[in-house]
Structures are given as structure tokens and as C-alpha cells.
UniProtKB/Swiss-Prot annotation:
Family statement drawn from the similarity comment of this UniProt entry: Belongs to the ATPase A chain family.
CDD domains: ATP-synt_Fo_a_6
Name this polypeptide is given: ATP synthase subunit a
Lineage start: Bacteria, Pseudomonadati, Pseudomonadota, Alphaproteobacteria, Rickettsiales
Function: Key component of the proton channel; it plays a direct role in the translocation of protons across the membrane.
Localization: Cell inner membrane
Organism expressing this protein natively: Rickettsia prowazekii (strain Madrid E)
């Protein structure tokens, strides 16, 4: 049981804290989320604090990420999406660092837990809903009735669209958590298998392990991108009501 690939996802209490009857203990998940936040802020500080005409590699990498997020908002929302750059950029950076931290040996992947990803998805869901009502008022409810829907079909379409809308934070959070968990389980299983193979094949399985780790890093970046691009699409529904 100690070799189970799922043991890496166990939540461990480090500081037991009770508040108003609720368990708000400081856990290994808390540490890695705090570490991801600290590393994100440090990275951005070092990249942008002393900007130069001829940028450093760190500055170039940060500008690439910033432009990526800005392009996502521009392509999905247009010029009106610029005001959401701080929110979406912070979201992307945080998820990216959480995902990448999980790739380090004996670490913990915070984004493999649904409570973490659902909280992030709920933040986007509430932002979209609030922005939609502020910008369009009651007209925002027309989002649940596609234009041109026949009157006799309207009640069914409203129910379907409302259910789809309410399911957004669930699907968004499950997608990220499931992909991160599946990837790490696969990596753990193949790593254990590779160690066994090394007894007979010496160092031959190592290149396979390197390729797999590289693929997992790609998946970590891709999942942060997918979460962010879907968030931009949801924001577009609130701003450019169709």
C-alpha cells in the first residue's frame, strides 16, 4: 500500500487549526499553494522590477506569458477584455506554478485536488455572473435563451442552458484536477516500472523516463492554458452578450 501511486495526493495536517467549529488546518497543500504564490511574485518581481531596453531572458519569458494572456483576452473578448488582464494573468501564473511545482520529486500537486481547482473555477464563475449583471442588468438572463429559439422550445432551452451554465465551474475544475492526477499517477507507475527494468536493462529505460517527464511538463503548461482560455470564453459571455 505504501507504493500506491495515489499516496502522493494525501492531505497531511501540519498545524491543526480549528476556527468557529471548522477545520482550517495548515496542510501540505497550503504550503505548496503558498510556495506557488511566493515563487510567482518573486518571478514577476525579478522580471519586471528593473526592465531594460535589451531585456534579460527572465524579462522576455514574463513578457511572453503576459502577451499570451493579453492575446487570449483580445481574441475572445476584444478591447473590452483589457481590464481583466490582471485577474486572468494572475490565475494563469498561479495555476502554472502549482502544476510545475508538482513535477519536483517528493512534492505535492495542489491542483490535483478538486477543492483547489473548484475554488479557482468558482472565482471565475462568480466574476462572470457579477460582471454580466452589472453590465447588462436583467438582460443578462437572455444568455439562457439563444436568439431565434422557437417559443414552444424556449422552456426546454432555458433549462438546458441554465444547467450548462451552472455546470461550468464543475467541468472546469474537474478537467484540471483529473488531468493533473492522471498524469502524476501514470508518471509514478512508469517510474516504478522503470526502476524494476533497470535491474535487467541497466540505464536503457532512463531516456523513456526523461521523455515522459518532458511530456508531463508540457501537460502542466497546457492545462494552465486550457483553464485560462476557457475562463476568457466565459468572460466573453458576460461582456459581449449574444
Amino acid at each position: 500500500m505504501t507504493h500506491s501511486p495515489l499516496i502522493q495526493f494525501n492531505i497531511k495536517k501540519l498545524i491543526d487549526i480549528k476556527m468557529f467549529g471548522f477545520d482550517v488546518s495548515f496542510t501540505n497543500s497550503s504550503i505548496y499553494m503558498l510556495l506557488a504564490t511566493t515563487l510567482s511574485l518573486t518571478y514577476l518581481y525579478l522580471a519586471f522590477y528593473n526592465r531594460k531596453l535589451i531585456p534579460s531572458r527572465l524579462q522576455v519569458s514574463a513578457e511572453i506569458v503576459y502577451n499570451l494572456v493579453a492575446d487570449m483576452l483580445n481574441q475572445n473578448i476584444g478591447i473590452k477584455g483589457r481590464k481583466f488582464i490582471p485577474l486572468v494573468f494572475s490565475l494563469f501564473i498561479f495555476i502554472l506554478f502549482c502544476n510545475l511545482l508538482g513535477m519536483t520529486p517528493y512534492s505535492f500537486t495542489a491542483t490535483s485536488h478538486i477543492i483547489v481547482t473548484f475554488t479557482l473555477a468558482l472565482l471565475i464563475f462568480l466574476t462572470v455572473t457579477i460582471v454580466g449583471f452589472i453590465k447588462h442588468g436583467v438582460s443578462f438572463l437572455t444568455l439562457f435563451l439563444p436568439h431565434g429559439t422557437p417559443v414552444w422550445l424556449a422552456p426546454l432551452m432555458i433549462v438546458i442552458e441554465l444547467f450548462t451554465y451552472l455546470a461550468r465551474p464543475v467541468s472546469l475544475s474537474l478537467r484540471l484536477a483529473a488531468n493533473m492526477m492522471a498524469g502524476h499517477v501514470l508518471l509514478k507507475v512508469i517510474a516504478s516500472f522503470t526502476v524494476s527494468l533497470m535491474i535487467y536493462l541497466k540505464f536503457l529505460p532512463i531516456p523513456l523516463m526523461v521523455i515522459l517527464i518532458g511530456f508531463e511538463i508540457f501537460i502542466a503548461i497546457l492545462q494552465a492554458y486550457i483553464f485560462t482560455i476557457l475562463s476568457c470564453m466565459y468572460l466573453n459571455d458576460a461582456i459581449n452578450l449574444h
